[in-house]
Amino acid sequence: CAEEMLSLIEGAEMVKFGKNGSDVTSAAVRLARAYTGRDLVAVCADHPFFSGDDWFIGSTPISAGIPKVTQELTVKFSYNPIESVQALFQQYSGRIACLILEPEKETAPVDGFLRKVQELCRKNGSVFILDEMIWGFRGHRGGGQRYHQIIPDLSTFGKALANGFSVSALVGKREIMRLGGLEHEQERVFLLSLTHGAETHSLAAAMEVIRIYKREPVIEMMWRAGGGFGKGGRESICEHSFPDHFKVFGKPCC
């Protein structure tokens, strides 16, 4: 399954499988903190959910039970205004371990936003993470990163990966990912340990999904079906005079 996964994602050199999205986004954050020796995590304020773990939930309105010191380790930026990202790196110079965002949500990147974010991460020594839970296996076979022609340091996948089976994946560059293994002399990272981690049905499902994606026009079908659904939705909204209450947004595939 690892070989099948890596064959799809350009620039990915290693993969670690989990069971849900929070498993792998939190693992990505741990790796980034270990790799950089920094504590702060920058998250996109316009993307609603990255993890059920403290590092993210502590930055939301439902943060009861999470220590203040943990909440203060997550900072936010806005999607598309590159000045928002620049301001964070200036305010927290040398302190940001990683930056995480989705390739896009209902708003597409403009003026080379994703590439500019990547350049800022490189310039400031921070790990660039793309959360592909929604875009992965929907917008492009190689994810939103392939669609937008950008290679992150780490990226996370799930949802459509196994067509509903419980599996997620963290993929990325070897120099970062290897810290979650045993073959290095640096301080070890406790990457993932899951109660049902040895369950293999979901991995078998993921393997078959990837094989189907390689031989069938699944992505094209989703774009067509989503386009038809969106068109019908907009027509129905106008027909019933609901434009102030409902709207259709985002890419047809998602």
Predicted feature locations:
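Conserved N-terminal phosphate-binding loop of PLP-dependent enzymes in the Aspartate aminotransferase
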Residues: 1-254
